[in-house]
A protein has these predicted regions:
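Acidic catalytic loop of the alpha/beta-hydrolase fold
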Residues: 234-238, 264-265
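Catalytic histidine-centered segment of alpha/beta-hydrolase-like enzymes
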Residues: 262-271
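Hydrophobic, aromatic-rich cap/lid helix
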Residues: 190-218
Length: 279
């Protein structure tokens, strides 16, 4: 039995849905399997091969389909590598390197080496934001710019890891779709497909449940490359005001944006991130 999936049938259902979503990838793409010490890592590469590289890291309980709405714009000016995080419901190995240790950075070292990258800009969401920030702290010479969407590790975490409490306990009838709407802040009508996908995933997938390590002020102060932090004011996972304050106070070249009326799921930031990456 898999450690991250509840059943083989569930694994197959998630994989089938992922393949369906990947068929919507709007630009030319190379599907790569990069060997790492944690097992093979699945990477989607789009954009001109000689363009500046950008690495995308999605959140927990997700995969690189996260970036379907962004990739066409970003891949015009950049060589974009959408990396499926190991231990998450995508195409990468099921290993889960221990957070707060060198293990995650060593995995990313292998990914970058396999892609023949000495450095790149990073865009990370939630757990992917934590991962990108951890890499910037540990490998500052390998991160040229850092865009973080609802990142973990800066502001206080309100709940155990993603969706755990709400999905397990909030509703006696275990209405995963409605619970996902509350956690993400997405509307049941306007974002029905996204919430259906979240419900499918958490029906069959066991997420990380531990709290994310929080970076110290001293660690954040070493992140001297340009940083863009975007958070939702109504995030129920992390204290967004705390995230914005600490990022502004501790990181020398950070720009922070707090989006009113937005929860943990931050959509529609294609243009601001592209502008940041182009500077």
């Amino acid at each position: 039995m898999s450690a991250i999936y509840k059943s083989e049938a569930g694994r197959a259902a998630i994989a089938a849905r992922y393949q369906e979503l990947l068929r919507r990838w709007p630009v030319a793409v190379e599907q790569l399997h990069v060997p790492t010490r944690e097992g093979d890592t699945f990477v989607l590469a789009s954009g001109p091969k000689d363009a500046p590289p950008v690495v995308l890291l999605h959140g927990s309980g997700s995969n690189s389909s996260t970036w379907l709405g962004d990739i066409a714009s970003w891949a015009t000016d950049f060589r974009v590598y959408a990396v499926d995080m190991v231990g998450e419901p995508g195409g990468s190995a099921e290993a889960r390197p221990e957070l707060g240790t060198e293990a995650v950075a060593l995995w990313l070292d292998d990914v970058l080496a396999g892609l023949d990258l000495s450095a790149a800009s990073f865009v990370g969401m939630s757990l992917g934001g934590w991962t990108a920030l951890d890499y910037a702290v540990r490998r500052p010479d390998k991160v040229t710019k850092l865009a973080l969407l609802c990142p973990g590790g800066i502001g206080k975490q309100k709940f155990g890891w993603i969706f755990k409490n709400l999905l397990d306990h909030l509703f006696s009838n275990h209405d995963l779709r409605r619970s996902a709407a509350i956690v993400t802040g997405l509307n049941l009508t306007d974002h029905a497909e996204i919430l259906d996908d979240v419900a499918l995933t958490f029906t069959h997938f066991n997420p990380r449940t531990g709290k994310l390590p929080v970076f110290t002020d001293a660690q954040l102060s070493t992140v001297t490359m340009p940083v863009l932090v975007i958070v939702g004011a109504d995030d129920v996972m992390f204290k967004s005001a705390d995230t914005a304050r600490r990022a502004s106070d501790s990181m020398p070249d950070a720009t922070t944006r707090v989006l009113p009326g937005v929860g943990h799921a931050i959509l529609g930031q294609t243009a601001p991130i592209l502008e940041f990456l182009r500077k």
